[in-house]
């Protein structure tokens, strides 16, 4: 495996370059659950498009977002003094000192919370609880199960074993986009999870037609007719 990067644009998670970067990102989080790894990577798909050199809107500017996680402002990451960073300072050419391995440095900065980006309340002040009421209610469930009731640490996140919850946690605690597009990121997380070797549970298929439960209020003669149609005597073997 090797890191890939380019001055502009992103990589599809099904492309050879995108897949290599997915595996490289996962390798930087050895202690995280598979669910947490998939959540981080899926969110980055919707941020920097799996391209470590990606500038927000494909326009260069230190006040803009940069990299896999769209560190904003870019200057916070680039001037952080973190060892081994190697950003590309252009959207049209490769600048001196730039290296695709900047992706690894970005992941290390994220995983160590080096820049203090983690918001443990798992919500953003610019997200209206009224507008996003169902998502706000889900936040409460997530914090009760995986956090400390009213907050969650990065260490607790890395131990999360629920893919949907992990995707929401990283979206809310680390990325914090203007619009919390959780549903689309959740779908991407399922794809990344499978790429990393996870198996998405398939809900059982109900009988066709469904067998009504005993005591459902349906007349006895109708229950018998349905049971006969399904070629079963389960309701009358008592």
Regions found by a protein language model. Name each.
Residues 157, 163, 174-180:
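Residue microenvironments linked to proteolytic maturation
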Residues 34-42, 161-169:
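Alpha-helical scaffolds flanking conserved acidic
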Residues 2-30, 45-162:
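Peptidoglycan-targeting cell-wall enzymes and recognition modules
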Residues 106, 167, 235-238:
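Intrinsically disordered, low-complexity polar segments enriched in Ser/Thr/Pro and acidic
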Residues 1-38, 179-238:
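Extracellular cell-wall/glycan-interacting regions and their flexible linkers
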Residues 112, 169-173:
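Short, hydrophobic/amphipathic alpha-helical patches that form generic packing surfaces
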Residues 70, 81-93, 178-196:
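Charged, low-complexity, helix-prone segments enriched in Lys/Glu/Asp/Gln
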